[in-house]
Amino acid sequence: CAHPENNYLGIDITDKVLILAKRKIEAAYQAAGRPIDNVKIMSTDIERIKGVITPEDEVSRIYINFCNPWSKNDSSHKHRLTYPRQLIAYREFLKDGGEIYFKTDDDDLFRDSVEYFPASGYDIEWITYDLHENEPAWNIRTEHEGMFTEMGIKIKALIARKKPGADSVTWVDPKVLKRMAREAAAAEAAAQEGEGNV
């Protein structure tokens, strides 16, 4: 409610999280004596975001705070909110020069995300492995952030900026790489078989 010039959309797949967010939003706007006219919240799977937000919506900034790290195994990584396939999906509605603010307590997720962002067409403009050491003025501490900090876990954060142009994306889906390898092997086998018949 401090920035009435901005519109906000809060998305989570968990209704419990959204109910708490709704209560906090209502309390903040009531305390400010303002109607809730620039905030919406919704429950959806972020992997289906392209059905919710379109390029015409022109999003300037995305905040990804303490998302599920999906660390069980390599195959679960594809569900990460910072996995390249997802970061590329955000590019469709994030305007050129738009930013993603990302915070996490998870070391593995952060380390991998530092690689995901550049491969997905983003420049990492700011990064820290201890957000509270020199806490920036823009940081708004979340409940999860407070909980992890009390446990002695350092909060990692970065700001990434979308590069213009599709050619800035260098990531290739592993399924595509596997298919290309199969096709190349089949073509080579066919060529060798053809040479044997001559």
Where do the protein language model's features map onto the residues?
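Conserved SAM-binding loop of SAM-dependent methyltransferases across substrates and taxa
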Residues: 1-5
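Conserved SAM/SAH-binding beta-strand->alpha-helix loop
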Residues: 14-15
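A short glycine-rich, Lys/Arg-flanked "PGG" loop and its adjoining helix->strand segment in the class I
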Residues: 78-99
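Short beta-strand element of Class I
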Residues: 6-11
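Conserved class I S-adenosyl-L-methionine
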Residues: 73-76, 101-120
